[in-house]
Amino acid sequence: ADSCVLFVEAHGATMLFPGDIPARAELQLIASGSLPEQIDILVAAHHGSDTSSSQTFIDRVDPEHTVFTTKQANRFNHPSPRVLARYQKSGGALWDTGRHGAMCFRKRPARNLSATAMRIGYLPYWAK
């Protein structure tokens, strides 16, 4: 599969957006040597489907936060329970946009990265 992979480093935080790359492309990305030691924010490849997120890749990028871009009650059952279990094993925070809504990450000098889920604690105007 052809997919755009984007790595961003800003304000002391690292973010990786692997698009829809399959597990074999994850291994190629690791072999390229272009990844930093640890990723702060990872958007899970292919919405957390079984085609991506190999244990080797997860162990290598060691994400502090992983975001699964899904739709509430999606028909594909993303993220896959097997993929979710692999990320849970890594110990980082897991976020699902289908459940948590939009995500806001903030990095301030000399502070840890903070995450805010817009669907938790923020009610839309019609729900107030």
Where in this protein do the model-derived segments appear?
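Binuclear metal-ion centers of metallo-dependent hydrolases, dominated by the metallo-beta-lactamase
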Residues: 72-128
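Active-site-proximal loop/helix segments of hydrolase catalytic cores
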Residues: 1-79
